[in-house]
């Protein structure tokens, strides 16, 4: 199979055809970017994130009519041995997108994950680890870390615990498939539809800032 046939097979299997969204008003998704003040990262890691990884995610989602409305502040991720990490600087009614150097071991079970998405004490939280985060690299296998984690929220996986075994792997593949379709074909109609429902649920939840 040639590379072209491979890409076309993805589009065919997923019913992929880019759906123009230019005439539609953009769907606003509020994202609260939180820089982990406890992280130990290199300057080039931050530069790579702000110049490559994050802009790529913003462009991809914009291509299907989703606008990330972002704010930025410094927070902290405190890692405590044997118990849940403590994340400071979160807001309600937004996706809290925490930028750190590594995922707490209690959340990644020592697997050196590039990102994680979860509900943390009622807050909606995505976290990326700059030690492992990357742009789009390989369709279906290594997609943009920010896109991958945001899709777990926008497609409403965040409301359910990750299934064990092959069901969990299937959910990850589903996210990578959606990310690949968005990346290669700008096909995000299903994402936008799910995201609209997600934003309504997100903004119905109110908690004070921690």
Model feature map: region roles:
Residues 1-14:
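N-terminal secretory signal peptides and thylakoid transit peptides that target proteins
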Residues 15-18, 78, 96, 113, ...:
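Polar low-complexity intrinsically disordered regions enriched in Ser/Thr and small residues
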Residues 132-210:
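The catalytic-center signature of Zn2+-dependent metalloproteases
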Residues 88-163:
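Active-site-proximal segment of zinc-dependent metalloprotease catalytic domains
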Residues 7-8, 18-106, 159-162, 199, ...:
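Propeptide-to-catalytic entry region of secreted or membrane-anchored zinc metalloproteases
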Residues 2, 42, 46, 184-186:
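Helix N-cap and loop-to-helix transition residues
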Residues 4-5, 18, 112, 182, ...:
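Positively charged, low-complexity intrinsically disordered regions
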